[in-house]
């Protein structure tokens, strides 16, 4: 007599789906399935016990959850598509917040709303082609600058560095960026100065440097007066008074990714003495 096996709450990778709150800040692998809080059983995921009867099951509210990089919505679960640490940002209002996978990758995938540093590689008609480190260049209109009109065109040349924001980023269209905010103001965006040094770091280091609790930039500002621009595409532009100070700042920023807090304090103390 043939035995019928039930599939149960198993993930694509063959392992049991886990509750999303139990794996926060832990390493997740591609193929794992994560169950959102509003879909968990009282007994645990896939428990063998009987589930309690819910009289208001039909009126149960669904949490609004935003899937960031490395995650994909699969029914009532989240499917992991990248290896890394699972992160969560609490919502400002109602909802379940934002979940994403923090991975150590160098290849940038454009995301809507990201502020990036690009390099103008071509000019065709009224459109600039800007290299942002993705699979294809982004398009930038000459009208996407503060105060730009058909008569008053911005002075942008091939090879210039552009700091702007991605406004279109999906798999079916080429990326599009602008150098103005929603009010039409530059707000720090536009062509970056000719002097300074541009170098590339990992995307994880960029997120670390831009975190609210990161003190690295403040500590660097105490060493030398500097100008610095961070791009979410892994590019950093820095400028100090002298070339030597600029190179020191770039080397320290690159090394901070693999330093502990104590090692970083020792390096800053040595630089302050010299």
From Swiss-Prot:
Modified residue annotations for N-acetylalanine: 2
Gene3D superfamilies, alphabetized: 2.40.50.100, K Homology domain, type 1, Nucleic acid-binding proteins
Name of the top EC class for this enzyme: hydrolase
Main location as per UniProt: cytoplasm
Alphabetical GO biological process terms: CUT catabolic process; DNA deamination; isotype switching; mRNA catabolic process; positive regulation of isotype switching; RNA catabolic process; RNA processing; rRNA processing
Glycyl lysine isopeptide (Lys-Gly) (interchain with G-Cter in SUMO2) crosslink, residue number(s): 150
EC number(s) on file: 3.1.13.-
Any GO MF annotation of the entry: RNA binding
One cellular-component annotation, GO: cytoplasmic exosome (RNase complex)
Family listed: Belongs to the RRP40 family.
Subunit structure as annotated in this protein's UniProt entry: Component of the RNA exosome core complex (Exo-9), composed of EXOSC1, EXOSC2, EXOSC3, EXOSC4, EXOSC5, EXOSC6, EXOSC7, EXOSC8 and EXOSC9; within the complex interacts with EXOSC5 and EXOSC9. The catalytically inactive RNA exosome core complex (Exo-9) associates with the catalytic subunit EXOSC10/RRP6. Exo-9 may associate with DIS3 to form the nucleolar exosome complex, or DIS3L to form the cytoplasmic exosome complex. Exo-9 is formed by a hexameric base ring consisting of the heterodimers EXOSC4-EXOSC9, EXOSC5-EXOSC8 and EXOSC6-EXOSC7, and a cap ring consisting of EXOSC1, EXOSC2 and EXOSC3.
PANTHER family tied to this protein: EXOSOME COMPLEX COMPONENT RRP40, PNAS-3 RELATED
Protein purpose: Non-catalytic component of the RNA exosome complex which has 3'->5' exoribonuclease activity and participates in a multitude of cellular RNA processing and degradation events. In the nucleus, the RNA exosome complex is involved in proper maturation of stable RNA species such as rRNA, snRNA and snoRNA, in the elimination of RNA processing by-products and non-coding 'pervasive' transcripts, such as antisense RNA species and promoter-upstream transcripts (PROMPTs), and of mRNAs with processing defects, thereby limiting or excluding their export to the cytoplasm.
Name of the protein in question: Exosome complex component RRP40
Source organism per UniProt: Mus musculus
Origin organism lineage: Eukaryota, Metazoa, Chordata, Craniata, Vertebrata
């Amino acid at each position: 007599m043939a035995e019928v096996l039930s599939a149960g709450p198993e993930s694509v990778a063959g392992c049991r789906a886990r509750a999303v709150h139990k794996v926060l800040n832990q390493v997740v692998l591609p193929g794992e399935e994560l169950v959102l809080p509003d879909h968990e059983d009282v007994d645990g995921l896939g428990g063998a016990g009987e589930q309690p009867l819910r009289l208001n099951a039909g009126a149960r509210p669904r949490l609004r959850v935003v899937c960031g990089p490395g995650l994909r919505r699969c029914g009532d679960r989240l499917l992991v598509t990248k290896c890394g640490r699972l992160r969560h940002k609490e919502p400002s209002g109602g909802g379940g917040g934002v979940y994403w996978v923090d991975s150590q990758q160098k290849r940038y995938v454009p995301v809507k709303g990201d502020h990036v540093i690009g390099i103008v590689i071509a000019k065709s008609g009224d459109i600039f082609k800007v290299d942002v480190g993705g699979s294809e260049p982004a398009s930038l209109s000459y009208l996407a600058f503060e105060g730009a009109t058909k008569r008053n065109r911005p002075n942008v040349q091939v090879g210039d560095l552009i700091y702007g924001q991605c406004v279109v980023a999906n798999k079916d269209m080429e990326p599009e960026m602008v150098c103005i905010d929603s009010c039409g103001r530059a707000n720090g965006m536009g062509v970056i100065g000719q002097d300074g040094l541009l170098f590339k770091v990992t995307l994880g280091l960029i997120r670390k440097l831009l975190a609210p609790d990161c003190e690295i930039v403040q500590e660097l500002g105490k060493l030398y007066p500097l100008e610095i621009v961070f791009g979410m595409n892994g590019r950093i532009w820095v400028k100090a008074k002298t070339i030597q100070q600029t190179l020191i700042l770039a080397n320290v920023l690159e090394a901070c990714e693999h330093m502990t807090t104590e090692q970083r304090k020792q390096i800053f103390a040595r630089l302050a003495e010299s």
